[in-house]
Amino acid sequence: MRQVTIPLIQSKSMFCVIYRSSKRDQTYLYVEKKDDFSRVPEALMKGFGQPQLAMMLPLDGRKKLVNAELEKVKQALSEQGYYLQLPPPPEDLLKQHLSSVGQNTSSADR
């Protein structure tokens, strides 16, 4: 019986390390290497505060990112060395309510 050797193929899967801001709620900083903020602007780091490790994540598409697009994250990491995820804009409940009230009254006038 002849043995067949199958070469191991190492995929160059991109990983990122995600940090939570100590100063800003729902703000996250993605970097390529753990504790390496050398490519992050100093002013951004001051506003971000002490980074708190949230998780390490492969960017191979198996896990969905929350509030971030995978391709934008990959592009930002390769081009500038970091990606900053800001919180989603707050819902304007008053505006939504007034809009729905306005729609209801205009349809009732007909």
From Swiss-Prot:
Pfam families noted in UniProt: YcgL
InterPro entries in the cross-refs: YcgL-like_sf, YcgL_dom
Compositionally biased tracts (Polar residues): 97-110
SUPFAM superfamilies in the record: YcgL-like
Disordered, as annotated region: 87-110
UniProt domain YcgL: residue ranges: 14-98
PANTHER family: PROTEIN YCGL (PTHR38109:SF1)
Record protein name field: Protein YcgL
Organism field: Salmonella newport (strain SL254)
